[in-house]
Amino acid sequence: MRKAVKINGVAAVAGAVVATVVLAGGPATGQQDATAAGPANEAFAAAAAEFDVPRDLVVAVGYGETHLDGHGGKPSQDNGFGVMHLVSNPKRHTLEQAADLTGAPAHALKTDLATNIRGGAAVLRALADEHGLDAADRTRLGAWYPVVAAYSGATDDRVAKMYADTVYDLLGNGVRANARGEDVVVAGQFVRPEQGRFASVRALDDVSGDVHAMDYPNSIWNPAHSANYSVGRSSAITTVVIHVTQGSYAGTISWFQNPDSQVSAHYVVRSADGEITHMVADADTAWHARSGNPYSIGIEHEGFVDDPSWFTDAMYRSSAALTTWLCDTYGIPKDRSGIVGHNEVPGNDHTDPGPHWDWDYYIQLVNGG
């Protein structure tokens, strides 16, 4: 049985409960050493120096995207690669941009740790130039806020702001992560983000105005693009399908809002604090499980199937509360006959939620445990 672990003092950051985590409940202790021995630390230091990007910022962006896990060069849901999540899809081309900026081949940018980090730093610097940051500006972590928001690739300013806030919360709380067996540390530090135009952008979790729950009361309504789901249903709702995003929370929301993605889910759950974004009304058919779409509700969980650090207790509990509500609302059995993994839906070739998802603990929570 999985023991409950309380996550204290971390909001809107990619916290976790194993060794490859932000230090929940407080910042990373001690001073970070940009010259620490090891290929990952050396790569971050070298890339930061080459492109005049703060080393801690590069680490925080990478951690927010992937927990510094390149996943062996395998693509994310929106076809992003490596610890810096360099993307190649119809709407975003940071992988190709990194290749142009660094002269590195795409294959190396996808699979080689140092090359990928160098590519991410190059893209950040190019965005800084676009935003008019001069040499003095680039020395101030706070000045990079609009650049980080742009790195998200989000078309919704609220999602871009959430992405940047996550990175700056990581800088404030500190990071201690494991990259291929090597500790990478960012000491917690006070940073005042210079938000620029994002200062007037309403936060995604601001429930005033039209940001409200559509179905589940404890969720934020931020709809997917209408090209990515079908209005109405051809079958009654009988099943909850558990997914893992293979990407970040902000990235997944942005991907579902991209009309080229042709994919969506009803709900997305954040790793750090269990925040839930509702993207397709329950009465409509999200495109998440092929043959299972007509009769199911899809819940995406931020993270990657091969990295258990994303599956926090806050995520489990928040998702389980949502599933309990869905089961009570639609008469779905609160067991493994009514709550299934994406891999268990007929006609699917996906593997999520994967071997690290604790089904016993989750079903216990759904049933009030």
Q: What is the role of each PLM region?
A:
Residues 37, 43, 184-290:
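N-terminal catalytic cores of peptidoglycan-degrading enzymes
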Residues 50-54, 77, 116, 140-142, ...:
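Extracellular/periplasmic catalytic domains that process cell-envelope and extracellular macromolecules
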